[in-house]
Regions:
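Residues forming the ATP-binding cleft of Hanks-type serine/threonine protein kinase domains
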Residues: 407
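A contiguous, mid-protein "functional segment" used to position or interact
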Residues: 417-465
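Formylglycine-dependent sulfatase
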Residues: 1-396, 401, 410-431, 464-495
Length: 495
């Protein structure tokens, strides 16, 4: 019998914040048990350090440049199969509880059921404009300044509903006459900023030494060009937060992880209570990481380890606990789910591989590279990343290149791009970028997509509105973000 698959996804969780990845203070007993009894992929990366595009590449097993979805307001075609499509063809009942950030009329992309509304807009509200990029109403320094304790926030409201619906679905499946195995994706918004948590989770870190950034805030001159643009976009350029502000934000981030852990525990308890745990693969990951003050940077949108490296844990009763050091990324999930489910062969080439091929190997396969890209706001040109063995290469035709040796320089402080001894490696990486991506064609496609979506957005905001959001109710425009309010006014609406 094919196994059930429970896919737990969180938002903006950097791998290094979990004990399974070396942290010393995180209180996350449910995730700790999952890691102790499962497979921990030590070097897992997202393929695009931004919420929606990361999910698109993960769902399709392809890079966003290949599926034509470039930012947080992009849709990918309904004809592109996702893991939900492949699993349904293999006989699975597929359901989604929580955030997936689908844009456009197709709000299912292969899922049979959606148990909640999405947290964010499904329209083109957030289309970037490379031709005339201005300050957008998104991340800003208030996320750090207001960090601390709250009783309730919109993110708490949302994740409580996500958990309730997921638990209810597990019980519904146990009572159902539907004999198909299930695939349930439970997708949370924590620990995404603002850095707020309830007092009971804040108090878990009383007396703990909160780990401060290893690399303190850099001067504008010491930052790479993309970091400077991001800091300008966040309204943080030239701001040096006090140590107590940084510590408070990081403590609240840990508190959010602990809160998240308590929700995940409820879902796992339901799995055990129904007996489904005996035949269920549990997969846990995040869409991307969080800079968390390193180099004076916050949030995501860059290729530094804090923003790019994500936790990836797979647990099943019949899979031996182990740690895998090979490079992996989120595009590997589609072929892995397909392998577990016995899905038909993919109809097109995929970027990812089956992670099960990396387990218990006396002779592990040669290390393949991991690719990532950034094609969204706050850049005038595509930025590409290749991680091959210990080296990370970041390339932008506008900004130049960076090369880091992560074994010798884990904090990514020494750019080796101009090092004479590293020139053969730099040239090889440059050639790999040219082979992997046709930048001229990609830029043309991105600019045209932005113009098209901006026009459609303006048209849809004129006259009678027809919303794409799944199951949209009148109150959703108040509860969840729909572009009616300013983003930060909505995100910081807490008590």
């Amino acid at each position: 019998m094919s196994p059930n698959i429970l896919f737990l996804q969180v938002d903006q969780l950097t791998a290094s914040a979990l004990r399974a990845y070396g942290d010393r203070i995180c209180h996350s007993p449910a995730l700790d048990r999952l890691a102790e009894n499962g497979v921990v992929f030590e070097n897992a990366y997202c393929n695009f350090p931004l919420c929606a595009p990361s999910r698109f590449s993960m769902a399709t097993g392809q890079l966003c440049s290949a599926v034509g979805a470039y930012d947080n307001a992009a849709e990918f075609s309904a004809e592109i199969p996702t893991y939900a499509h492949y699993l349904r063809v293999a006989g699975y009942q597929t359901a989604l509880s929580g955030k997936m950030h689908f844009i456009g009329p197709d709000q299912f992309h292969g899922f049979e059921k959606r148990l909640t509304a999405d947290l964010y807009p499904a329209d083109f509200a957030w289309v970037p404009n490379w031709a005339n990029e201005g300050k957008r109403d998104t991340n800003d320094d208030r996320a750090v300044r207001i960090a601390g304790i709250c009783e309730r926030s919109v993110q708490i409201d949302y994740d409580e509903e996500v958990t309730f619906r997921a638990v209810q679905h597990i019980y519904d499946m146990a009572r159902s006459s539907d004999e198909r195995p299930f695939f349930l994706q439970v997708s949370y918004t924590h620990p995404h900023e603002p850095y707020l948590c309830r007092k009971e989770f804040w108090d878990l870190y009383e007396g703990k030494e909160i780990p401060m950034p290893k690399v303190s805030a850099l001067s504008e001159q010491a930052h790479d060009p993309h970091s400077v643009r991001l800091l300008k976009d966040f309204g943080m350029l030239g701001i040096r937060f006090k140590d107590e502000d940084v510590s408070r934000a990081i403590r609240a981030y840990y508190g959010s992880i602990s809160y998240l852990d308590s929700l995940i525990s409820r879902v796992l308890d339901a799995l055990s209570a129904t007996g489904a745990a005996e035949n269920t693969v549990v997969v846990f990951t995040s869409d991307h990481g969080e800079m968390l003050g390193e180099r004076g940077m916050w949030f995501k949108k860059h290729f530094f380890e804090k923003a790019l490296r994500v936790p990836l844990i797979v647990k099943a009763p019949w899979i031996a606990a182990q740690r895998v050091s090979e490079l992996t990324s989120l595009v590997d999930l589609l072929p892995t789910f397909g392998s577990l489910a016995g899905s038909p062969a993919p109809v097109e080439p995929l970027e990812g591989i089956d992670l099960m091929d990396l387990l218990d190997k006396g002779n592990p396969p040669p290390q393949r590279p991991v690719y990532a890209e950034y094609l969204a706001e706050a850049t005038p040109a595509p930025i590409f990343m290749i991680r091959r063995q210990n080296h990370k290469f970041i390339s932008s035709s506008h900004d130049g290149i960076m090369l880091f040796d992560l074994a010798a320089d884990p904090d990514e402080l020494t750019n080796l791009a101009t090092s004479e001894v590293h020139q053969p490696l730099v040239e090889a990486f440059c050639e790999e970028v040219r082979t992997k991506w046709n930048e001229t064609e990609l830029v043309d496609a991105i600019l045209l997509s932005q113009k098209r979506r901006a026009l459609v957005r303006d048209a849809m905001n004129t006259g009678q509105k027809h919303l794409w959001n799944h199951g949209e109710k009148e109150t959703d425009s108040v509860l969840w973000y729909r572009g009616v309010q300013g983003y930060n006014e909505w995100a910081f609406d807490y008590i």
